Amino acid sequence: MWVSWAPGLWLLGLWATFGHGANTGAQCPPSQQEGLKLEHSSSLPANVTGFNLIHRLSLMKTSAIKKIRNPKGPLILRLGAAPVTQPTRRVFPRGLPEEFALVLTLLLKKHTHQKTWYLFQVTDANGYPQISLEVNSQERSLELRAQGQDGDFVSCIFPVPQLFDLRWHKLMLSVAGRVASVHVDCSSASSQPLGPRRPMRPVGHVFLGLDAEQGKPVSFDLQQVHIYCDPELVLEEGCCEILPAGCPPETSKARRDTQSNELIEINPQSEGKVYTRCFCLEEPQNSEVDAQLTGRISQKAERGAKVHQETAADECPPCVHGARDSNVTLAPSGPKGGKGERGLPGPPGSKGEKGARGNDCVRISPDAPLQCAEGPKGEKGESGALGPSGLPGSTGEKGQKGEKGDGGIKGVPGKPGRDGRPGEICVIGPKGQKGDPGFVGPEGLAGEPGPPGLPGPPGIGLPGTPGDPGGPPGPKGDKGSSGIPGKEGPGGKPGKPGVKGEKGDPCEVCPTLPEGFQNFVGLPGKPGPKGEPGDPVPARGDPGIQGIKGEKGEPCLSCSSVVGAQHLVSSTGASGDVGSPGFGLPGLPGRAGVPGLKGEKGNFGEAGPAGSPGPPGPVGPAGIKGAKGEPCEPCPALSNLQDGDVRVVALPGPSGEKGEPGPPGFGLPGKQGKAGERGLKGQKGDAGNPGDPGTPGTTGRPGLSGEPGVQGPAGPKGEKGDGCTACPSLQGTVTDMAGRPGQPGPKGEQGPEGVGRPGKPGQPGLPGVQGPPGLKGVQGEPGPPGRGVQGPQGEPGAPGLPGIQGLPGPRGPPGPTGEKGAQGSPGVKGATGPVGPPGASVSGPPGRDGQQGQTGLRGTPGEKGPRGEKGEPGECSCPSQGDLIFSGMPGAPGLWMGSSWQPGPQGPPGIPGPPGPPGVPGLQGVPGNNGLPGQPGLTAELGSLPIEQHLLKSICGDCVQGQRAHPGYLVEKGEKGDQGIPGVPGLDNCAQCFLSLERPRAEEARGDNSEGDPGCVGSPGLPGPPGLPGQRGEEGPPGMRGSPGPPGPIGPPGFPGAVGSPGLPGLQGERGLTGLTGDKGEPGPPGQPGYPGATGPPGLPGIKGERGYTGSAGEKGEPGPPGSEGLPGPPGPAGPRGERGPQGNSGEKGDQGFQGQPGFPGPPGPPGFPGKVGSPGPPGPQAEKGSEGIRGPSGLPGSPGPPGPPGIQGPAGLDGLDGKDGKPGLRGDPGPAGPPGLMGPPGFKGKTGHPGLPGPKGDCGKPGPPGSTGRPGAEGEPGAMGPQGRPGPPGHVGPPGPPGQPGPAGISAVGLKGDRGATGERGLAGLPGQPGPPGHPGPPGEPGTDGAAGKEGPPGKQGFYGPPGPKGDPGAAGQKGQAGEKGRAGMPGGPGKSGSMGPVGPPGPAGERGHPGAPGPSGSPGLPGVPGSMGDMVNYDEIKRFIRQEIIKMFDERMAYYTSRMQFPMEMAAAPGRPGPPGKDGAPGRPGAPGSPGLPGQIGREGRQGLPGVRGLPGTKGEKGDIGIGIAGENGLPGPPGPQGPPGYGKMGATGPMGQQGIPGIPGPPGPMGQPGKAGHCNPSDCFGAMPMEQQYPPMKTMKGPFG
C-alpha cells in the first residue's frame, strides 16, 4: 500500500522548492499583496506568489453579484446575474506562468447540468481561447484546453462526477510541466499528460463562468478562487470548509490526505539541518524497507529548508498501529542523493476520516452545509491592489469615428449587396435668392489676367481699405542707343508691334527665407535709382499698338522649400485654368532710361536718342500671353537669423520710378497668426457696386456626406505627376503648425461620363477656418475732392497772439463748454521759406500736380521699331538679412455704404484711417488750466520694441512735418461728439507717432478669439471713394499731458505770423456769440498731428482708383445661408495615430446602421472551438467578375447546383468522353422512316436514366429454361370439365376383386356405359407410367402466386427486331433497374443531314465538374447598387459553395456551347444537335403504318420519371452483348474563355500614399498698366508698412493678439 503513496509523498516533498520562483516572481505578485493564505494556516511563507481572482475580477465591487453571509467562513458569492470578465492585462499584467495551480471552492446549481460552459477562460486579442477550463455537464467532466506551440489546441479531460452532486466542493487544478492534475476535495481525481503550450500573453480577457454557446454568464456559488504560481501548493491547500470533521488545526493537509498512513512531517530546524520524514504504514513492514524509503525521501527533503522555518522534534512521534511490531527502528539518514526526475502523480489516496466538529457549528439537515456561528470581526485588511476594471456597462451611444486602423490582410470577398433603389429624379428648381456672403474661402491659385474692365461708375460710400498690390515691377529693358535728336513734334500715332524678342535667361536662384518671415507676402524689390528727369512734354502720346507675343522664357529656378504662397493675390482677371503655383521673388525695378530730347517735327531722319518718358499714355491692349517657362530649381537656404538680428530694420529707400509691371511673384506663406479681438459690428450698408472678380478660392472642406449618388464608371488612371526636387527645409522649427498639405497635382483627364442619375445634393460643407489677419495695406490713393456745397466766404479773423507755454498744472475738472469765439481775420501770406534739409530715408509723399503745360504739336507716327535685344536675365530679388522689406497684405473690400449726400447717424468707431491732410488752422484757443500729472508711460511696451531711436526718428520724422493742405469744403456744423477715450500716456513725439499709428492696426488685428483658427484671406475690395469732409465736432476735454518726447525733426519754416507782444495766458472766457463766417484764410503753418476724429459721414463717390494692396482680413461675418454643394475637397493629410483609449462602457443598442464597406480583414486568428453549424443564409446576388486571380488548387467537387434556365440551342458538340448509359426515354410516336443519318459524334456521357416504359411486345423468344418449382398457389375454383384426355397408361394390376355375377351376353362386343360405380377404396400408388403425349392446352387458370426465383438460365440468342407495335398505354413507372454493363461503341456512321434547330430543351442536371477554363476578359462595370441593408454575418462557406456551383454550371453550359462551335472533321461537320425536350402530348392520332426501322438515334436526355407502368410479363433474359470497340477518350482541354461576366465586388483598397508635390506653375503675365494715381498724403503707416509685424511688435508672453 505504501508504494501507491510514494509518488504522492515524493511530490509533497517537492512543494518547498521554488526553483521557478525566480522566473514567476516578475509575473506573480506576493501573497501578502494579494491577501492569499492557505486554508489551514493564517499566512503563507513570504515568497509564495499568486493571484486573488476575487479581488482582481472585482467580484466584491460588482453590485450584480449577490453576497451571502456565511458564519464561520468567507462570503458566498452568487454569480450568474452579470458576466464576470476583466481585461487580461489587469488580471495578469505580465501573463500567467507556465506552471500554476487554480483553486476554487464552488457549488454547482441544478440548471447548469445541461450546459457546456467555461468555468475559467483567458482569451487572446482576437477572442480565441488561450487557456480554458470547460465544464461538460452531460459527460460530468472537466476539459482543460490551451493553445499549443504549433497553433493547434492541446487538451486533457478529467472525469469529475462528484462535482455535480449539488454540494460544496473544492476544485484544484495544477499544471506542472507537461502534466495536469485535478484534485476534488483534497483528493486527487486524475492526472493527464498535456502537450507543449504557448506562453499565455496579457492580451484579451479573463472570464469566469461563461456559457460556451450563448456567451451568457452561468449561475453558480463561489467562495474562493485564486491562482498559485507554484503548482505544488495544491498539496498544502486544506479542505476544512468542505470536510469540517477531518481538519484539526494543527495538522497539515498532507497529514489529512494520508490519515490511514499516519504521515508525520519533520520540518527542518532553524539551524538548517534537514531531517527525514517518517512513514507509519498500515501493515508492519521490515525495517529495511522503511530505511530505504526514508533514505530516498530524505534526498528530497532539503528543498523544504527554503520555506519552512518552524522547528520540530528531532525524532518521529510513535506510530499508533496496534498490530505493529515494536522492533521497527529508524535508520540513520543516508547521504544526500542527487535531484531526481519529477515523478508522475501518485494514485488517489484513501478518503480521510471525518474531522472533529467545530465548537460553534451546527448542521441543520443532513444534506445542508455546516452552519457556524459568526466569529469576532477581524481587523481591517490592508488596502487591496488595484482591482481590475468592472464589467462592461450597457451599450453606450455610438462613439465618434475612430482613427483609421492599419490595413489588414485581404479578407474573403463579402456578400454582394442588394440592388439599390433607383435614384430620385430631381427637377432643377428656380434659382434662389443670393445668400448672405459665406465665409471667405482660402486663396485660390491665380488665374491668367483678364483684359482690363471698363471703369465703373463711382460708388457711394466710405472708402474701402486699400486693395491688393499689382505685381512687382519687372526688369526694365536696356538703355537704347542714342540717336540724333529729332525735332519736337506732336505725339505720333502708335507704331507697329516690334519683332518678338529672344528668350530671356532664367532668373537667379532665390534663397529660402529664414524662420520668422514666413507670414509675409512676397518681398518688394529694392528701390531702383531715380531716373533723370525728362523734359516737360506738353501732351500725352497715343496708346501704343499691342505687342507681339514674346518668346517662351527660360526656366525659372524653383524654391520648393518655400511653401506655396497662399496669401498672394494677383491681378484678378477671368478665371483661367488652375496652374500649379509658381515661386519666385519679385524682381528689382530696372534702371530708368536716359531721357531723350523731344525734337520738333522734321523730316524722317535717323533715329534720335530715346526721349525722356512723357506722361503715360492710355493703357494699350494686353499682349499675347507668352509660352510657359520651365520650372525653377531648388534654392539654397538663407543662413539663420540670430535673435539679435531682429533689431536690424531696413528702411525703404527712396522711391524709384515706377517700373513696368512685372509678373506676379509668390511670397512665402505666413505663420498662422492669432486671431485679433472682434471689433464692434457696424451697421449694414447699402450694397456697393460689384467689385472685380476675386481669384478663385481653394476648395473648401468637404461637405457633410450627401446621400450616395449612383457611382459612375471608374475613369482612366491619371498620368503620374512629376516629382519635385525638395529644397532644404526651412531653418528653425515651426511651432504650432500642422504639416502643410502638398501642392495640388495637375488636373487629371476627364473621366468617362458616369452612368445613372445624379444623387441628391449633399449637405453644405463646414465653414472654412478663418485665415490670419493680413498686415495693413499700403495707403490708397486719395479720392477726388468732395462735392459739397461751398459755404460763404468767411470774414478774416484777427490773428491770435501765441501764448507762452505754461507749466503743466494739475488737471482741473472739465469746465463748462465755452461759446465759440469769433472768426479771426486771415493773416498775411508769408514768404516762402528756404528749402529744408532732406528728409529721412522714408520717401516723402508725392508733391501736388504741377500746372498743366501747353499742348505740344502732334508728332508723326513713328516707324516700326527694330527688334529688341535679348533681355537681361531676370532678377529674383532675394533680400539680404538687413534689407527685409515687406509689403502689406491685401485688404478686405469695404462694406459700408452711406446714403447719398445726407450724413448718416454716427456709426461705431471704425478702423482708424490714416491722418488726413491738415485742415484749415483754427483760432488760437485760450490756454487751458494745468492738467493733473500723467500716469506712467508705456515704457514696457516701447522698451521691448527692438527699434532704435534713430530709426524712430527717421521713421516718424516726415509724419510730423505737415504739408500743404488741400482746401477743405465747409459743411454744416456737427453736433458735439461724445467724450473721447482718455489718451494713452504720453510718450515722446516719435513714439507717440509710432503708437498712434500702429496700435489701431494691432488692435484691429485682434479678434475675440485670440486662440481661434486663422480665417481665409478675403478677396480684394475696390478702393472706395473718399468720404465727405466730416462735421467738425466740438472741442473735447483736454487730454492728460504726456511726458515730453525727444525733439522732432526740424520742420520747414512756417509763414511769418503777425508780430504780437506775448501776452500772459488769460483765463478761459465766456463763450462768445457765434461770429459771421469769415473769408477763407490762407493756409496756416502745419500743426501737430491731431487725435483721430470721429468717423465722418460717407463721402461722395470717388473715381475708381488703382487696385490697392491686399488689406487685412475683415471681421468674421454672420454665417451665410448654406451654399450649393461644393466639390469634394482634396483629402487632408493623415493625422498621427492616436493612442488606444480606455475601454468604454457598453452603450445602448443603436439604430440599424447603413451597411458599411467591407473593412480591412484582420490577421487570421487561431482556430476557435468548433461552433454550431449555422443555418444557411440566402444566396446573395450575382457578384461582379473580379480581376484574374492566380489559379488555385483544384477544389473538391461541390454539391450539384440547381438546374439552370434553358439555354439557347447550341451547335453540335465535339467528340466528348464516353457518357454514362442514359435512362431509356419515353417512347415517341412512330415517325416516318428517316433517311439513315451518319453516325454522330458520341455525346457527353449521361447519367443513368430511370427505367423506361415497357417497350413494344417482341417476338416470342425461345423457351427459357424451366424455372424452379414455385410455391403451391392458392386453391382455385374448380375449372370447367376439360376434354377427355388421352388414355393413360395401364396401371398396375390390382388385386382381384370378388367375382361378379355374370351378366347377360351383349349384342355387340362393347356394351353401353354403365352407371358410375361407387368410389372404391384408395388403392396403392401404381408405378409411374410412360409419359403420354401432351394434351391440348387448357384455358388459362387464375394467376397463381409468384413462385420462387429460378436459377439464372443460360443467355438466349439475340432475336430479330420485330415490327414496332402500336403505342401502348403508358405503364406505371418501374423500379429503378441496376445499371447494365457498358456496351461496345458502335461503328461511326456516315454524316447525316443537318437537322433544323430543335426547341430549347429543359434544363438538364448539372454535369460532372470539368477542368476550370481560362479566365474570360473582365466585363465592363455595371451600375452600382444602392447600399444594401445591414445583413447578417456573412457565411463565407455558403458564398464559396454558391459561387462554385454557379461557376461549374456556367462552365458546363459554355463548354458545351464552345465545343459545339469548334472545327470538326468533314465527316462530323453535320452532327445532329442535342435532342430537344419532349413536346406536349398531341391529340392521339390514328395508328400509323409501321415504318421501316430507322437507325438507332442518339441517347436522349434524361426524361422525367414516368408513372409506374403496368407490370409486364417477365421477359427472357437477353444474351450478353459484345464488348464495345471504342477507346475511352481523354479529358478534354479546358474550354475557351467564358463570356464577359458581370462585374465583381472588389474590396475597397487601402488609401494610397499622398501624391508628390506638383511642379510649380509659371507666374502669370503682367497685368495692364493702371492709370497713374494722384499725389498721396503723408501716412504714418507707410513708415511701418514695410516692416514685418514681428519687428514692430515683438512677442511678449503676457500679451495676447498680435503682441503675443
Swiss-Prot record:
Region listing for Nonhelical region 7 (NC7), in residue ranges: 632-652
Annotated stretches, region: Triple-helical region 9 (COL9) with 3 imperfections: 375-506
UniProt region (Nonhelical region 8 (NC8)), positions on chain: 556-572
Keyword Glycoprotein: yes
Region annotation (Triple-helical region 6 (COL6) with 1 imperfection) ranges: 653-723
Biased composition, class Pro residues, residue ranges: 449-460, 905-917, 1044-1055, 1160-1169, 1199-1208, 1286-1302, 1330-1342
Gene Ontology CC: basement membrane; collagen type IX trimer; collagen type XVI trimer; collagen-containing extracellular matrix; endoplasmic reticulum lumen; extracellular region; extracellular space
Chain spans, region Nonhelical region 10 (NC10): 232-374
Pfam family, one: Collagen
Tissue specificity statement from the Swiss-Prot or TrEMBL entry: In papillary dermis, is a component of specialized fibrillin-1-containing microfibrils, whereas in territorial cartilage matrix, it is localized to a discrete population of thin, weakly banded collagen fibrils in association with other collagens (at protein level). In the placenta, where it is found in the amnion, a membranous tissue lining the amniotic cavity. Within the amnion, it is found in an acellular, relatively dense layer of a complex network of reticular fibers. Also located to a fibroblast layer beneath this dense layer. Exists in tissues in association with other types of collagen.
Region (Nonhelical region 2 (NC2)): 1434-1472
PTM text: Prolines at the third position of the tripeptide repeating unit (G-X-Y) are hydroxylated in some or all of the chains.
Low complexity biased stretches: 383-397, 686-702, 766-781, 792-808, 826-846, 1271-1284, 1369-1378, 1420-1429
Region (Triple-helical region 8 (COL8) with 1 imperfection) location: 522-555
Alphabetic keyword roster: Cell adhesion, Collagen, Extracellular matrix, Glycoprotein, Hydroxylation, Repeat, Secreted, Signal
Region (Triple-helical region 1 (COL1) with 2 imperfections): 1473-1578
MF term (GO), any: integrin binding
Residue ranges of the region described as Nonhelical region 3 (NC3): 989-1011
Domain of life: Eukaryota
Chain positions covered by the region annotation Triple-helical region 5 (COL5) with 3 imperfections: 739-876
Compositionally biased residues, Gly residues: 486-495, 1386-1395
Family per similarity comment: Belongs to the fibril-associated collagens with interrupted helices (FACIT) family.
Function: Involved in mediating cell attachment and inducing integrin-mediated cellular reactions, such as cell spreading and alterations in cell morphology.
Domain comment as written in the entry: This sequence defines eighteen different domains, nine triple-helical domains (COL9 to COL1) and ten non-triple-helical domains (NC10 to NC1). The numerous interruptions in the triple helix may make this molecule either elastic or flexible.
Protein name: Collagen alpha-1(XVI) chain
Provenance organism: Homo sapiens (Human)
Organism phylogeny: Eukaryota, Metazoa, Chordata, Craniata, Vertebrata
